[in-house]
């Protein structure tokens, strides 16, 4: 009997394969959509920029005029001491949060709500932004970073600007240790060893004098977890012949 393979250990959900969420800053979203925002604006000040292990972009701690402190996503160029406004009468300026109906066409935005008051669901990745294409009665057309155009309720809020943290993927890791700790912070397991490179006790494709599966790589849908590796329930494999 061989050892349990990686998919079996991952499915068990032990601490090795769980994301260390106890280190995360928590939910990062817009402030509650209250009457103060619907009729005017709320003003806050950036008091601190923080690193969040859960994401690749910095987050800002903002202290609002009523004394409330909240972590929010901020655009490129934000610094400690900047003033942030939230509400229908907020100024059209990077970092401010307004309903889509109040934002002109062509302005870059991020952290867009899917439903009014849900805190933000779209365009939250580092360095990304969406663009308002057009306003219509009861709907706003927004082009997402993927290029897809989606309609939103005009009451949904968004933050003006380009999401901070851009260029993250352009910087090389250089060292394997950095890549390991980066993956570990999100619960990823790295490096991922190939089955044919393992010993026979560790994987069905392991062992032998040279690296090869040594058996058919197609596997039935109902086979047990310890054997279920390779092409699962494949209708065909390979490139196929030209007809």
Swiss-Prot record:
In its UniProt record, which GO terms are filed under biological process?
cytoplasmic translation
Q: What segments bear the compositional bias annotation Basic residues? A: 228-243
Q: Which Gene3D superfamilies match?
A: 2.30.30.30, Nucleic acid-binding proteins, Ribosomal protein L2, domain 3
Q: Does the keyword Metal-binding apply?
A: no
One GO MF term on file is:
rRNA binding
What InterPro entries does the annotation carry?
Answer: NA-bd_OB-fold, Rib_uL2_dom2, Ribosomal_uL2, Ribosomal_uL2_arc_euk, Ribosomal_uL2_C, Ribosomal_uL2_CS, Ribosomal_uL2_dom3, Ribosomal_uL2_RNA-bd_dom
Keyword set, alphabetical order = Ribonucleoprotein, Ribosomal protein, RNA-binding, rRNA-binding
In this chain, the stretch annotated as Disordered covers: 1-23, 204-243
Question: Gene Ontology terms, cellular component aspect?
Answer: cytosolic large ribosomal subunit
Instruction: Note the PROSITE patterns from the entry.
Output: RIBOSOMAL_L2
Superkingdom, according to UniProt?
Answer: Archaea
Assembly and oligomerization: Part of the 50S ribosomal subunit. Forms a bridge to the 30S subunit in the 70S ribosome.
PANTHER family under this entry? Answer: LARGE RIBOSOMAL SUBUNIT PROTEIN UL2, RIBOSOMAL PROTEIN L2
Checking NCBIfam families in the record gives: PRK09612.1
The UniProt similarity line reads: Belongs to the universal ribosomal protein uL2 family.
Listed name of the protein: Large ribosomal subunit protein uL2
Recall the taxonomic lineage recorded for the source organism: Archaea, Methanobacteriati, Methanobacteriota, Methanomada group, Methanopyri
């Amino acid at each position: 009997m061989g050892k349990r393979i990686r998919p079996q250990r991952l499915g068990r959900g032990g601490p090795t394969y769980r994301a260390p969420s106890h280190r995360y800053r928590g939910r990062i979203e817009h402030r509650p959509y209250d009457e103060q925002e619907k009729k005017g604006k709320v003003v806050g000040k950036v008091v601190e920029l923080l690193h969040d292990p859960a994401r690749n972009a910095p987050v800002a701690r903002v202290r609002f005029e009523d004394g409330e402190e909240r972590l929010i996503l901020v655009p490129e160029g934000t610094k400690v001491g900047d003033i942030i406004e939230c509400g229908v009468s907020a100024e059209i300026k990077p970092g401010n949060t307004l309903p889509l109906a109040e934002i002109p066409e062509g302005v870059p935005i991020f952290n867009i709500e899917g439903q009014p008051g849900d805190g933000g669901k779209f365009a939250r990745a580092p360095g990304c932004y969406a663009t308002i294409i057009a306003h219509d009665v009861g709907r706003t057309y927004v082009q997402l970073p993927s290029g897809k155009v989606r309609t939103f309720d005009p009451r949904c809020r968004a933050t003006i600007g380009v999401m901070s943290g851009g260029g993250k993927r352009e910087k090389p890791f250089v060292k394997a240790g950095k890549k390991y700790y980066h993956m570990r912070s999100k619960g990823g397991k790295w490096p991922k060893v190939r089955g044919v490179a393992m010993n026979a006790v560790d994987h069905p494709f392991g062992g032998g004098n040279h690296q090869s599966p040594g058996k058919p790589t197609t596997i039935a849908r109902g086979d047990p977890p310890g054997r279920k590796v390779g092409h699962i329930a494949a209708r065909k494999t390979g490139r196929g012949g030209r007809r």
